[in-house]
Amino acid sequence: MGRFSSLCALTAVIHSFGRVSAAIGPVTDLTISNADVSPDGFTRAAVLANGVFPGPLITGNKGDNFQINVIDNLSNETMLKSTSIHWHGFFQKGTNWADGAAFVNQCPIATGNSFLYDFTATDQAGTFWYHSHLSTQYCDGLRGPMVVYDPSDPHADLYDVDDETTIITLSDWYHTAASLGAAFPIGSDSTLINGLGRFAGGDSTDLAVITVEQGKRYRMRLLSLSCDPNYVFSIDGHNMTIIEADAVNHEPLTVDSIQIYAGQRYSFVLTADQDIDNYFIRALPSAGTTSFDGGINSAILRYSGASEVDPTTTETTSVLPLDEANLVPLDSPAAPGDPNIGGVDYALNLDFNFDGTNFFINDVSFVSPTVPVLLQILSGTTSAADLLPSGSLFALPSNSTIEISFPITATNAPGAPHPFHLHGHTFSIVRTAGSTDTNFVNPVRRDVVNTGTAGDNVTIRFTTDNPGPWFLHCHIDFHLEAGFAIVFSEDTADVSNTTTPSTAWEDLCPTYNALDSSDL
């Protein structure tokens, strides 16, 4: 325990300067607790992993077995005392029980207890993240970066540096606990980059600093840990060459700005080819205070040898903004199925709606079951109608091509664009936001899709090769809380043959169900 405590202390010190902490993993403890933090100069209670925000960087190599023991020491009932952690982007083949979505894949971990997540990064590498998947708890702080390195990275010759110093996290930060604030906040109080930021009208607190050496090439890993807004990200005076989207390698694509939605990740190569100086890093949110006055929504790119002062660089108009449709997967780029809309084994159209309080998909608002879907399946329930109320769960056949469409009208999806995340898979986006064109030859492939605005009909495809119940939901956490989700039960009959939960997993529900309401 002494070595672990020392690591936590070191992590806290490093985070105070807006740098990503020393990496932990793939075998590690992750202690979840409450503490007061002031990342933008305003002090509030938060939910933290290992005592820091964002949570510590967890790393491993392609093929590694991750064993992460989550210890729940939460005591503040306003932000929930229970927790459940989702390892965003991992397929969890054969370990659906470790996916972490509360009441879909497990019961929450009760305060005073621990739970070991044990899964393997089989054939996966890239940029991931982890966060609470219980109510809106991650908005209160429980979110952090995760990287799986590939010793045989096909893009390795494009960069010189790829380590904890090249992680860039974007987070919306609220001065009020999620359960005490508005159901649908109109913007956050501040944007935090690597855990630091300023809020409008606040003090000029320290900004995060990312240091580079002139002449070197850096693989920057950009992660949106957002609960709500999307961001337009840029670095004054520098282009960015994207090589990865959501842990999928893509052909290099050079841009000067990236619009990134909640849950999405990008790797881009930044060449430090400018004068030795300080340059603003900018993350303009889609809601809230949408300016850079006084250094808000900003961080600093500092060349070694530059003065330790705020930059004086100015924002310029983007001339090479990212168009998602221009991203081409490096390997096996073709979408599954036939090259026409509907040319799949199973096509599903998802109609959205909102009644002022709840979101609906095909006229149903998702309500978490009291018994997790996976537990129901393993207990012998296989009918979609028996697992969840009609319309909340769709049974998908095995080894089939699936097409999902998200038509958006002027009235059916307030708060658009909505970023939708599918657990257990990546998918090909055969029709992207802002376009009526289709691409079945080499469409972008990822695990979070911007479903666009009025007139869009974003369409994705994937293949059912991963038995289990998988969540599909809006990654604006306030919208998920309001029912904006469905569950796919994939190859339901084979789940019991491919998924063997741990004994500790089986104990989660009896322990959670025995809690007093004040300890939930």
From Swiss-Prot:
Per the UniProt entry, the disulfide pairs are 107-509, 139-227
Stored PROSITE patterns: MULTICOPPER_OXIDASE1
Query: Where along this sequence does the record place binding of Cu cation 2?
Result: 88, 131, 475
Instruction: Give the keywords, sorted.
Output: Copper, Disulfide bond, Glycoprotein, Lignin degradation, Metal-binding, Oxidoreductase, Repeat, Secreted, Signal
Q: Where does Cu cation 1 bind?
A: 86, 421
Question: Pfam families given for it?
Answer: Cu-oxidase, Cu-oxidase_2, Cu-oxidase_3
Which EC numbers characterise this protein's activity in its record? 1.10.3.2
Q: Which cofactor does it need?
A: Cu cation
Domain Plastocyanin-like residues, every copy: 24-149, 161-303, 370-491
One GO cellular component assignment for this chain's record is:
extracellular region
Annotated Cu cation 4 binding sites: 418, 474, 479
| Sugar-bearing residue positions | 73, 76, 239, 399, 497
Task: Give GO BP annotations, semicolon-separated.
Answer: lignin catabolic process
Q: What class of enzyme is it?
A: oxidoreductase
Q: Where does Cu cation 3 bind?
A: 133, 423, 473
Which protein family is named in the record? Belongs to the multicopper oxidase family.
Protein name per the record: Laccase-4
Q: Which organism is it from?
A: Trametes versicolor (White-rot fungus)
Its lineage opens with: Eukaryota, Fungi, Dikarya, Basidiomycota, Agaricomycotina
